[in-house]
Amino acid sequence: QRARFIGRVFQDPSKGTCPELTILENMAMAEAKDKHFGLTFGVNRKRLDFYKSQLELLKLGLEDKLHIQVGSLSGGQRQALALLIATMTPIDLLVLDEHTAALDPKSADNVMRLTDQFVKEKHLTALMVTHNLKFAIEYGNRLIMMHKGNIIDAAYEKKDALDVDDLLNQFNQISIEVGN
């Protein structure tokens, strides 16, 4: 019941989509996640136009490739599609589990730009797990670090003034205090 309101994107681009299915089939299945549907699969022209318009948001040219298998896409394309699919239906929480870790820098930047766009446009709460301190500072509005299973709030009030070096120094200081 609660899962209907949670979208998630995994670290591995292949985990958020079905590689043997087409882009169109993946999108139709994602949209039908809380609906009852039978064995008949069909998409009418109105839905097809909607899927194309959603894919245009990615700016990857996928709107012209609806009938290709997702397994033939690059990692960055698959991750952008997984992000789109995760946010296609109304959700409240978007869980991002290192969703840029397996991508090259250009694809990671694109996926983060899309993530920021979708979170803002759809007014989502996002929980992003990342080791990329640059992304954490640039896109996060609250930083929470974990150290040996303990949660550490990283300067909540001063977050906007942090840079990567400040965050690394804070983490190193915590490590020293704990005895590492």
What positions do the PLM features span?
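A short, proline-enriched helix->beta-strand linker immediately N-terminal to the Walker B motif
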Residues: 87-92
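ABC ATPase NBD coupling module
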Residues: 1-7, 12-15, 19, 37-40, ...
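H-loop/switch region of ABC-family ATPase nucleotide-binding domains
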Residues: 130-131
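Helix N-cap at the start of a conserved alpha-helix in ABC-type nucleotide-binding domains
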Residues: 105-107
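Walker B catalytic motif
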Residues: 98-99
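Helical segment within the ABC ATPase nucleotide-binding domain
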Residues: 109-121
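Q-loop/switch helix immediately C-terminal to the Walker
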Residues: 21-36
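Conserved beta-strand-loop-alpha-helix hinge in the C-terminal portion
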Residues: 150-173
